[in-house]
């Protein structure tokens, strides 16, 4: 039945089955530029979900194109094209999930239940299979040997204030590395979520680094080693930066703010 529904979706969308996929992600790029805004300082962003709601048909059109991509087509893409596709799909489908209940929610967690988190809801088709947001992040992006880049944790957006910013543009293959690095720099420069505490001498960082510590350690000797490369972002005082570079600061994890990252 699911395969039949996918086939019908493709057949009923003119040109979708045979058109080459647009790796500029122009439809999503237009929506993001229109409905995502950086907050003062440029470290965090807000989404205008009311605006996304008004442009819901445009969002659906983009997601229909994403859902129409076959596994065979995907397999023929470059690594950067694949990762940009998955990040954009995750972020756009997250907005779509929020719109299923907007404005009657305060957090994406309101869309879950005691038995199932919102990230495990299978509500869309991707590469020919019914998927959840967790399927994209945990099963595809974080799959060992697929991309192995911890910077993705500053790219996929969970529609929450505690989450690294939703970008006001689409991720694209030819500038993906720069976009991922920029996301890390912006997030670690936000001292409301990542900072050195001079009173305690400890590094207070987002809970993301606790949840996914092994991803960061896999690219360095340890999480502390990975963080040390960004000492100048985590602290303003050169003395505190040196403590971070020498990996002498103990780590504390800050509470995560699951409040919706809404403009309202």
What are the roles of these predicted feature ranges?
Residues 13-14, 102:
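Single-residue recognition of alpha-helix boundary sites
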Residues 20-87, 91-264:
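Interaction/scaffold regions that mediate signaling and macromolecular assembly across diverse proteins
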Residues 15-19:
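Sec/Tat signal peptide C-region and signal peptidase I cleavage site
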Residues 4-13:
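Sec-dependent N-terminal signal peptides
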